[in-house]
Amino acid sequence: MAEAWFETVAIAQQRAKRRLPKSVYSSLIAASEKGITVADNVAAFSELGFAPHVIGATDKRDLSTTVMGQEVSLPVIISPTGVQAVDPGGEVAVARAAAARGTVMGLSSFASKPIEEVIAANPKTFFQVYWQGGRDALAERVERARQAGAVGLVVTTDWTFSHGRDWGSPKIPEEMNLKTILRLSPEAITRPRWLWKFAKTLRPPDLRVPNQGRRGEPGPPFFAAYGEWMATPPPTWEDIGWLRELWGGPFMLKGVMRVDDAKRAVDAGVSAISVSNHGGNNLDGTPASIRALPAVSAAVGDQVEVLLDGGIRRGSDVVKAVALGARAVMIGRAYLWGLAANGQAGVENVLDILRGGIDSALMGLGHASVHDLSPADILVPTGFIRDLGVPSRRDV
């Protein structure tokens, strides 16, 4: 199995591209419109440098931290992503990998596996919801998550409908039936490893979302749930406060890019915020999340935990984010490429890559712990930071 191991996230992406049908792979790299934001999410990290210490490195480094009360062995958690049809194990395989590496699993309400199965694989699971279907529907969804044992709730606000992608939108079928299988077979048959994995289970990729129905039921098709989300009016801050109170436990608001929104989130009583542009799948032209992080972190201080997602490909990226104010980062595409490349072991491989990179960067900076990191460790070029939602001088 030596050939199954990969050295970098970039290699995992290459293997995912080789092993997945084109339409499945395209769903992993898809982003809004021109893809300006998704490209900037990655490129922005390369603009940041380090200020290393040549003397004083310790022989052992502590990467552990906590996220919304959950102890994690490294400052990386799994971001919730929908319908993980890249591997038959899907979200359960990812949850097991996260548990094996000592971190939190984020489970999407658009996931293909029931929350009960995922929490059985990893008790440290945060359940994610969109503002979809109104208060009554959300109350049912949240109560099921509570009964299943979810230890945190994530509310995603940074996803809007993209009206055009220059490379084309992913061709996701409405449901997986015989007609669909026959239509996709010419594409799938060119990827025998992927096809054989599903053939062994005697089940095609599941495009239903079981966590949007009652326990034990298959749930609605993906696009039925997606349509309900599109038809639901966006939430108000009062809605966010209501949902936080309803949940009554650790509560993260995902998608905060502006200082004024971050302050409103604090007022709403959230436990954590994630600086995020939904991996470039929101409003194209939004700055990279790492550019917005320093201003948001400075604005809220220690009133709430601040996380970041978007563009994480290396352990050094994680270190840059933590130094600039993040408690931890959330990864999405990186672990999905690992899942496609080698199932659960591939996700563990990705987490190991990030762990090794974090450790190496800490050593180079002369720090014994991720908690020792600060902005002084990072070279930030002039004009890099985007302080969105801050009144300009002429407005003051």
UniProtKB/Swiss-Prot annotation:
Species of provenance: Mycobacterium tuberculosis (strain ATCC 25618 / H37Rv)
Function field: Involved in the biosynthesis of the enzyme cofactor mycofactocin (MFT). Catalyzes the oxidative deamination of AHDP (3-amino-5-[(4-hydroxyphenyl)methyl]-4,4-dimethyl-2-pyrrolidin-2-one), forming an alpha-keto amide moiety on the resulting molecule, which is called pre-mycofactocin (PMFT). This reaction occurs via a 5-[(4-hydroxyphenyl)methyl]-3-imino-4,4-dimethylpyrrolidin-2-one intermediate, which converts to PMFT. The alpha-keto amide moiety is the redox-active center for the redox activity of mycofactocin.
CDD domains per record: alpha_hydroxyacid_oxid_FMN
Secretion signal, residue range per the UniProt entry: none
Necessary cofactors: FMN
A single GO molecular function term of this UniProt record: FMN binding
Enzyme class of the recorded protein, top EC level: oxidoreductase
InterPro entries: Aldolase_TIM, Alpha-hydoxy_acid_DH_FMN, FMN-dep_DH, FMN_HAD, MftD
Every FMN hydroxy acid dehydrogenase domain range: 1-383
Active site: H278
The protein, known as: Pre-mycofactocin synthase
